[in-house]
Amino acid sequence: MVRYRMRSLSERPHEVHGQQVHGQDQGHNGQEEQGLNPEHVEVYERTHRGHSHHRRRRCSRRRLHRIHRRRHRSCRRRRRRSCRHRRRHRRGCRTRRRRCRRH
């Protein structure tokens, strides 16, 4: 009985304190949500932008320019070497593979 009373007494202040803290947390949650949302958004944007940025960097100016140059030179010879080398190295880009296969 005493243990039960001790538990109830210990639970009640936690409940009351929890309600107060929860009430304060609700006030803080508005601020924390605003504080956490930008953090989550930043992390999400970092991961999202990071992947898209890598994709853009892999296939953007330099690579496409090199591909165009190689096409004009001799695509068949360069195509085999470059595609194999790219696949081994960075697994190549789909656009590059498609363009190499087409030409």
Curated annotation (Swiss-Prot):
Residue numbers carrying Phosphoserine: S8, S10
InterPro entries for this protein: PRM2 (IPR000492)
Annotated segments matching region Disordered: 1-103
Biased composition (Basic and acidic residues): 8-17
Compositional bias annotation for Low complexity: 18-29
Principal location class: nucleus
Entry's Gene Ontology BP terms: chromosome condensation; nucleus organization; spermatid development; spermatogenesis
Keywords (A to Z) from UniProt: Chromosome, Developmental protein, Differentiation, DNA condensation, DNA-binding, Nucleosome core, Nucleus, Phosphoprotein, Spermatogenesis
Localisation per UniProt entry: Nucleus; Chromosome
Compositionally biased residues, Basic residues: 48-103
Post-translational modification: Proteolytic processing into mature chains is required for histone eviction during spermatogenesis. Transition proteins (TNP1 and TNP2) are required for processing.
GO molecular function: DNA binding
Family: Belongs to the protamine P2 family.
Subunit-structure text: Interacts with TDRP.
Function description: Protamines substitute for histones in the chromatin of sperm during the haploid phase of spermatogenesis. They compact sperm DNA into a highly condensed, stable and inactive complex.
PANTHER family: PROTAMINE-2
Protein name according to UniProt: Protamine-2
